[in-house]
């Protein structure tokens, strides 16, 4: 081989080596980019799921608040009924006393 042929061969090998290195680097960059895109996609899926869960929880909270309001109304009505029963028991006791007094 002549010096120029040998120089061209070395230059070709050098260029080939640089190209191989650049292709490897680009391949690694593409893999890293793909992983990042997938991670971002997964993150957006998680955020979407979190948003759906929050909406479901909000509905549950609203339903619970409604149930608590209804229970408060029922409690108030039960208190009125308890007071009425207590008043009737007192009146019944008074009537019994009056009957005993009349029957003596």
Swiss-Prot record:
Domain of life: Eukaryota
InterPro entries listed in its UniProt record: BORCS7 (IPR032143)
Pfam hit, one: BORCS7
GO CC aspect terms: BORC complex; lysosomal membrane
Compartments reported by the entry: Lysosome membrane
Keyword hit for Membrane: yes
Cited function: As part of a BORC-like complex may play a role in lysosomes movement and localization at the cell periphery. Associated with the cytosolic face of lysosomes, this complex may couple lysosomes to microtubule plus-end-directed kinesin motor.
Protein name: BLOC-1-related complex subunit 7
Gene name for this UniProt entry: borcs7
